[in-house]
Curated annotation (Swiss-Prot):
GO molecular function per UniProt: DNA binding
Keywords: DNA-binding, Nucleus, Phosphoprotein, Transcription, Transcription regulation
Assembly and binders: Component of the transcription factor SL1/TIF-IB complex, composed of TBP and at least TAF1A, TAF1B, TAF1C and TAF1D. Interacts with UBTF.
Modified residues (Phosphoserine): S23, S137, S232
Lineage: Eukaryota, Metazoa, Chordata, Craniata, Vertebrata
One protein family per Pfam: TAF1D
Annotated region (Disordered), positions in chain: 1-70, 82-116, 198-219, 257-276
Biased composition (Basic and acidic residues): 257-267
Localization: Nucleus
Paired cysteines (S-S): none
Organism: Mus musculus
Biased composition (Basic residues): 82-107
Record's function text: Component of the transcription factor SL1/TIF-IB complex, which is involved in the assembly of the PIC (preinitiation complex) during RNA polymerase I-dependent transcription. The rate of PIC formation probably is primarily dependent on the rate of association of SL1/TIF-IB with the rDNA promoter. SL1/TIF-IB is involved in stabilization of nucleolar transcription factor 1/UBTF on rDNA. Formation of SL1/TIF-IB excludes the association of TBP with TFIID subunits.
Protein name, UniProt field: TATA box-binding protein-associated factor RNA polymerase I subunit D
Length: 322
């Protein structure tokens, strides 16, 4: 292919050279004839064929894929491959300012303040919903505040749902009585009385009376658990607590008197109690009066002989001179 393309290019260049020579001859022969400008030669663009040269290692690998067994992946190989990978840098996002207004809105005076009351229409203020005339007379205010109206509306809704629940129980009980073929006189009673009659802690009780056995007929009060008792059995008398308080006060007084008597006896004997660790230890004291220190300084101005006499007596342990 390449040789044929080169040959065609050579032929085209020869033809162009011949035409150029002929034009030169004609121009030399006839000077007065108008000369035609030669048209530019259009060179053929050679299509570049890109050959992808595969490395020898790839060719050998492709040929020897069937012979070589696949290597088992290990953690070390996975980590090395992850480290060699070039991580793409994230593009830094430019700050795009939001179109929210900042600061105080313009066109409004600084003193004005938007309140919730200003947003409520006049019709909403007039029509407060449910009216409670008996509550208005008790509270003394004709237009009740919003908080009270909300609490009363909630109470009304609660009572309504309780009434629906009661009606549902009644309807269910009537259906059960019809299935049990109970009398019509039982259906005429109120729900509360029927509830206590047919329900018990252990389970549901049948409204149909069961026939009594022979033992129950002979001894009707044998298995009776209910007994009428006076009210005094249930009320605890307060005399017991008073007596108990008086006894406690007496015991306290006796203990205080005994402590005082012991302290007085210890003082008379001249004993003194001291703490030795965590135990009280009694120490006997001398009943004799101890000499006062510096007694000679308290006396008035004396003669030298009297002072010497007092000092001698003081050193001997005598409080007063003989």
């Amino acid at each position: 292919m390449a040789q044929s393309e080169v040959n065609s290019v050579c032929v085209a260049s020869d033809r162009a050279g011949d035409t150029g020579d002929q034009s030169d001859d004609s121009s030399d022969g006839s000077l007065f004839k108008t000369q035609c400008a030669p048209s530019p030669i259009q060179k053929q663009r050679h299509p570049t064929v890109k050959r992808v040269t595969l490395p020898a290692s790839v060719e050998t690998d492709s040929s020897s894929d069937s012979s070589i067994e696949p290597r088992p992946l290990t953690l070390k190989a996975i980590f090395e491959r992850f480290k060699k990978k070039k991580r793409k840098k994230r593009k830094k996002r430019k700050y795009e300012p939001k179109l929210r207004p900042r600061g105080r809105p313009r066109g409004k005076p600084s003193g004005t303040r938007i309140t919730r009351r200003s947003q409520i229409d006049a019709k909403q203020i007039k029509d407060k919903g449910a009216v409670f005339p008996f509550l208005e007379s008790e509270s003394g205010r004709k237009p009740l505040p919003w908080k009270k109206i909300l609490t009363y509306e909630q109470a009304v809704a609660r009572g309504f749902f309780h009434h629906i629940e009661k009606l549902k129980y009644e309807h269910h009980l009537k259906e059960c009585l019809k299935q049990m073929h109970a009398g019509e006189d039982l259906e005429k009673e109120d729900l509360d009385s029927r509830r206590h009659k047919y329900m018990d802690d252990d389970g549901s009780l049948s409204p149909i009376e069961e026939p009594l056995t022979e033992d129950e007929a002979t001894n009707p009060q044998a298995e009776c658990d209910i007994k009428l008792v006076e009210d005094s059995c249930f009320i605890i008398s307060s005399e017991f607590s008073r007596k108990r308080n008086l006894e406690q006060e007496k015991i306290k007084k006796e203990s205080t008197f005994s402590k005082k008597a012991k302290d007085a006896t210890h003082r008379e004997k001249g004993h003194r109690r001291t703490l030795k660790g965590n135990e009280h230890v009694t120490i006997e004291e001398d009943s004799r009066p101890q000499p006062r220190p510096f007694a000679h300084l308290q006396s008035k101005v004396m003669k030298k002989g009297e002072l010497e006499y007092l000092e001698v007596h003081h050193l001997c342990g005598l409080s007063q001179p003989l």
